[in-house]
Amino acid sequence: MERIVEREVSMKILSFGSLNIDYVYKVSHFVKKGETLSAEELNVYTGGKGLNQSIALSRAGMETYHAGAIGMDGLFLLDQLKEAGVNTDLVKILEDVRTGNAIIQNDEEGDNCIILFGGANQAISKEQVDEVFEHFKNEDYLLIQNEINELPYIVKKAKETGMKIILNPSPMNDKIKELPLNQINYFLLNEIEAMQILDMEEPKEIDGKYISGLLHQKFPEATIVLTLGSEGSVCISGDEYVEQSIYKVKTVDTTAAGYFIAGILNGKTIKEAMDTASKASAIAVSRQGAAPSIPYLEEVEEYKN
């Protein structure tokens, strides 16, 4: 049953991103070359950073539209988005391409290894992009990650439309550096992604304030949100610098990012938005599955550490 989510603001958010099917195998150890290994368990989840962030945004109270592509095997992903209140009218269904998917092995130590297949996520066309942006205006926001193709063209169309652009550069690779990063309004990233954008070698100790400061120097007009794992997160926006600790548990970037964006656009201060995001993340890590674990706004508001 589709849940009604109360909306607090009038602008729309376009999440143009990935839609995946995650096949998660529980194994005693990672399969080796030439080995046939029986899995102890198989779970199938909805996945993709794009899908997860769309759900987080919608559950945080934003009017959220997801654009992307799936194959005929991924129709159930639309049900998951709709149930969370996300508009799926801009998702293209392709008959000759399979939905993007991930084959994930989880071993007894809690580690994993992943094989990704881009599928329909890598079949975005310029024509589809043009059609999508006909539905948005200069008060709206675009959120992108790095799991679909045509990102440079998507950024170009967003700028022509006058939209603000939010970038979560994950997974990080050279495609991100090919984007006009000086046109990004919000960076949501972890310390490793930040160092790669800055062409830094990984230091022995991570200094979040130093790294976020370097990013701010490089992109002075942008708001920088840097997640630091167990150390929490930091944000620089203009002359404002804010640190946020975590609520006892490891941060979930997709959930935290969605709630931070929603908080800022709903008129919260940076400190308030970061605190809300940290609470949402703490709730999410206590549950199974990426998308199902994302809390609704009322749960976050009632959360006590």
Regions from the language model: what does each represent?
Residues 6-32:
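Positively charged, low-complexity intrinsically disordered leader regions
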Residues 3-7, 174, 205-305:
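Conserved phosphate-binding/catalytic region of the ribokinase-like
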Residues 4, 13, 33-101, 303-304:
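Substrate-binding N-lobe of the ribokinase-like
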Residues 31-39, 190, 242-245:
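Short glycine/proline- and charge-enriched loop/turn segments
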Residues 57, 190, 258:
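Short, conserved phosphate/pyrophosphate- and ester-handling motifs at nucleotide-, phospho-/glycolipid
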Residues 53, 77, 154, 260-261:
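Hydrophobic residues within alpha-helices
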